[in-house]
Amino acid sequence: MKKSFPTLLATLVWSALYSQHALADLAEQCMLGVPTYNRPLVTGDPNQLPVNIQADKTEANYPDNAKFIGNVNIQQGNSIMTAEQVELSQLDPATQGSTPTRTITATGKVHYDDNQVILKGPKAWANLNTKDTDVYEGDYQMVGRQGRGSADKMKMRDSNRYTILENGSFTSCLPGDNSWSVVGSEVIQDREEQVAEIWNARFKIGGVPVFYSPYLQLPIGDKRRSGFLIPNAKYGSSNGFELLTPYYWNIAPNFDATITPHLQTKRGMQWQNEFRYLTTPGLGVIQFDWLPSDSEYAKTSQQDNNDTRWLLHWGHSGVMDQVWRFDADYTKVSDDRYFTDLDSHYGSTTDGYVTQKLSTGYANQNWNTTLSTRQFQVFSNATSRDVYRAEPQLDINYYQNDIGPVDMHLYGQAVKFTNVNDNRPEATRLHVEPTLNLPLANRWASLNTEAKLLATHYQQDNLDRYRADPTVSDVNKNALQSSVNRVMPQYKVDGKMVFEREMDWSQAYTQTLEPRAQYLYVPYRDQSSIHTYDSTLMQTDYSGLFRDRSYSGLDRIASANQIATGVTTRIYDDALVERFNASIGQIYYFDRPRTGDRNTSLDKSDNNGSQVWAGDSFLKIDDSWGVRGGLQYDNRLNEVALGDAVLEYRRDAERLVQLNYRYASPEYIRDMLPNVTNQGSQQGISQVGVTASWPIVERWAVVGAYYYDTKANQPANQLIGLQYNTCCWAVSVGYERKITDWNSASRSSEYDNKVSFNIELRGLSSNYGLGSDKMLRSGILPYQRAF
């Protein structure tokens, strides 16, 4: 099985690439079978429009009635009725001065059409004043959209807004195709609300009833409507058979909710509840998933006696009165294995943590401030947790430009750090950072000279308990102090130039050459007396060569006496589309960077000179082909630290093939993520992958993804999906095999195998996509577009 999967995928991709048959757009194919209104559209009050009647023979009893016989054609506004015989009656109103009531009764091959619907039947009646129309034992077809059916009696009401069917049927399939239909004792189609209401509904597949409901709603457009959405089914080795039956609740124009009972035979019933809102302070989504009793988790979990699983997510973004900002990115789950066992849009087992961040801010012309609180839920063993929370954090920025030739920026921060572990230090940190910048620029060059002062005060607590904890391996723990002041100046000069020329081989292409050099000086300050609360060593890609800091946060500010140099070249076509770029650069250290922290790899290096090289490149061969790659070499490790490369062919959203490779050295992972205990990750990352999506034959589409870890000599992720699409239904099946955990006993990865099955009714909205993009993004290593 392991060997046949990539072979099958390669065969499918190879045959797709060399297929000589181009697929027509499915939406265009489907609309070929839908009638269109091609007469000039008449506007105005229908009651004031004239009635034109043509017939072979006319008999009249003026002004009460008239009979038209043979090839009768009646037209008023956008409506036309034809029949073999029509009787026109006119009833004088009871109130003098009112409009007479005019009705017609048509028999024999009756045909009615307007800009919304076509009706056919042996007999019809119509009120020309109200446009109410009845057709007996006839068929109907929507105009300009999919939807047709038949009924014992069809009634048009409220200026054709409603079509009411007695013992009627509805399907979005084209004429001649009865793959599915819904029949009911009464069917009401509301064109304004874009919904069909069906009483005593029987859902049929190929004429065979498979489902009954006393009441059913179907959307017949893109407008939001309350009702059940299409169910989804899948099977996996971890969860068993899964069935999702979402219900959409259109609460108000600015509020809606989706409630999804999610049956998992191995775990139980999970309730997934999503609420969306749009208000004056902003828009957001609240998700609450609840699994009251997870039988599978109760058997496998050894650390938690509670088998209740839940997820809470709140995402919000908004601006009020153009000055106030409100943001929320809050996700919390019941346990560390939640994303390993259960699927969710708000997290993945590969993330390693979720964030709980709330913030509010105020911004004016020259200053802004943000008050926030930030927590992390890290998925690791309880004994190794060392996670800090910023509760709260206040950030203030003040800008004043054009103070003579310089610009001024003042940054301030106050934050309180607490830890989930009671034996870890806690701190209050105050930081002030004034900056003066002298910008000089013309058309082809810029030179920015910057000077700043970094002043930080720490008040650290709980140090005695931290030093007494035997599980702590921090070599700096005895050097920590309760009160620490750190003041550091920083000086930086950053120069850029841009040279431009027309290409020798084509004047339609323009090439730029952009050299850059930056000198950075920060004096050394011993920071071993400061615990690390929010600082981690950052990776150094090409843009990272020109950062001020080696660490995120403020706890570690490395000394610097270095120059970073780099050069970028770009090629633009005559439409100013970037077709190619390449960048390469390095950092040369006159003195090795230090922080005084003996726990960090940065302080363990004694080397000066050129230590870090980084480069990246991009080539857009044409509108369909693109190549992207990057490489980082670290002399301190004497090896390539990071690398990635992507080759992609993308004709459109449904036709693409991507080859990719990513690499991270074991030394780099140990330096960047020293707390990672997963031995599968400690040995480094070297993964090659292929992702493909292609329609292989008419209306069939295949997607696949295969990632292989060359370090572990095992597949990292396998995904294949097949979808068949018609104008009125689609079906897809998929298989995924992914790594979910590391087994320390067997020293191997654990896998989950999942088979999914999904049926979708088409033609009810304007979506005719093949669904390839959705399947590709469902994997644990989702597809990411390269260009």
From Swiss-Prot:
Main localisation: membrane
Transmembrane segments: none
GO biological process, one term: Gram-negative-bacterium-type cell outer membrane assembly
Keywords for the protein's UniProt record, in alphabetical order: Cell outer membrane, Membrane, Signal
Compartments, as annotated in UniProt: Cell outer membrane
GO CC annotation: cell outer membrane; transporter complex
Signal peptide start and end residues: 1-24
InterPro entries in UniProt: LipoPS_assembly_LptD (IPR020889), LptD (IPR050218), LptD_C (IPR007543), OstA-like_N (IPR005653)
Protein family membership: Belongs to the LptD family.
Subunit structure: Component of the lipopolysaccharide transport and assembly complex. Interacts with LptE and LptA.
Physiological role: Together with LptE, is involved in the assembly of lipopolysaccharide (LPS) at the surface of the outer membrane.
Protein name as catalogued: LPS-assembly protein LptD
Species, as recorded: Pectobacterium atrosepticum (strain SCRI 1043 / ATCC BAA-672)
Chain's gene name: lptD
